[in-house]
Regions:
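Aromatic-acidic/polar surface patches that form glycan- and anion
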Residues: 67-71, 95-98
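Short, charged/polar N-terminal "headpieces" of proteins
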Residues: 1-41
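N-terminal compositionally biased, intrinsically disordered segments and leader/signal-like regions
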Residues: 5, 47-48, 121
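Active-site scaffold of zinc-dependent metalloenzymes
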Residues: 25-69, 81-85
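Catalytic Zn2+-binding segment of zinc metalloproteases
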Residues: 78-95
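Amphipathic alpha-helical segments in well-ordered regions
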Residues: 77-78, 108
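Post-HExxH zinc-binding segment in Zn-dependent metallohydrolases
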Residues: 92-121
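A basic- and aromatic-enriched beta-loop-alpha substructure that forms the phosphate/nucleotide-
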Residues: 73-75
Length: 121
């Protein structure tokens, strides 16, 4: 099976890139095998804390389709991605330390929205 495309985003602050892909039966040899399984019919998206391109750490959000990219689903997966990225740098979101997580969450949502709208150039 041919590699399916993904979009890589880097924000310049956190060392862990975010990758976003759309497709239920997505396959890409750049990624760990754990994230190349078909998304089940009732699951709109999945977020993976994984590695790609010769063991570089990354977070991958896979949406089953563009139709699945609703505000609710993007928000849900963006929070997973935010927590994975914070965990990678040894940080966490708390009531008393939420602002960095909020900005990171905002960035992840923005990346997903760019993919949804086809504005990734």
């Amino acid at each position: 099976m041919a590699n399916t495309e993904y979009i890589e985003f880097n924000n310049g602050i956190y060392p862990c890139p975010l990758c976003v892909a759309v497709g239920k039966d997505w396959q890409n040899d750049d990624f760990d095998d754990s994230c190349c399984r078909e998304i089940e019919d009732d699951v709109p998206a999945t977020t993976y804390d994984t590695y790609f391109e010769e063991k570089r750490k990354c977070v991958l959000i896979r949406f089953a389709s563009k139709k699945a990219m609703t505000m609710e689903v993007i928000a849900h997966e963006a929070l997973h991605a935010t927590l994975f990225i914070l965990g990678y740098i040894g940080s966490e979101a708390t009531v008393y330390n939420s602002e960095p997580a909020c900005y990171l969450l905002q960035w992840v949502v923005s990346c997903c929205e760019k993919v949804r709208l086809g504005k990734t150039e």
